[in-house]
């Protein structure tokens, strides 16, 4: 907390929005700009985490509207929201709206002669490049890289996850 001038407070009120910018409807796009495999993968994870949730029974269009990833546009048809495009869209459509959009993950080492050991980025072209798929791709890479010491539980099954997996 800090003391603001009256002018600064007026500026803050002028800048506030009643609606979050990420639910702005992108009227110029249809839902075909969203990657169906990403939506399918997200729904599988959603159902695993929220079994019995009423949204699991919804069709994709309704599900996306509940997530606020899609909404009716000025013509009354469905379009993605900014959040929906970023989360489920294809990188080449995302960069039409956000030209500087670029997700980049690198595994670097101390050897200055080696730029990186592994790299993936949203403009590779062989995957969607959206935020959700990027998260899944990087998380899987990090998860697979965790060393798991060989240990058996009392019931005879191998321990295949360690605390680091949970932290990730």
What are these model-predicted stretches?
Residues 1-168:
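Active-site helix-to-loop segments that bind/position phosphate- or nucleotide-bearing substrates
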């Amino acid at each position: 907390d800090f003391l603001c001038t009256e002018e600064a407070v007026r500026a803050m009120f002028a800048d506030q929005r009643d609606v979050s910018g990420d639910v702005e409807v992108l009227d110029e796009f249809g839902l075909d700009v969203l990657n169906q495999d990403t939506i399918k993968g997200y729904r599988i994870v959603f159902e695993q985490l929220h079994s019995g949730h009423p949204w699991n029974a919804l069709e994709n269009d309704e599900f996306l509207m509940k997530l606020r990833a899609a909404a009716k546009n000025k013509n009354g048809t469905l379009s993605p929201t900014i959040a929906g495009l970023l989360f489920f869209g294809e990188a080449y459509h995302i960069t039409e709206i956000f030209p500087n959009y670029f997700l980049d993950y690198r595994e670097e080492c101390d050897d200055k002669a080696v730029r990186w050991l592994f790299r993936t980025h949203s403009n590779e072209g062989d995957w969607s490049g959206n935020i959700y798929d990027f998260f899944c791709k990087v998380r899987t890479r990090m998860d697979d890289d965790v060393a798991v010491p060989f240990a058996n539980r009392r019931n005879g099954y191998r321990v295949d996850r360690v605390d680091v997996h949970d932290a990730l």
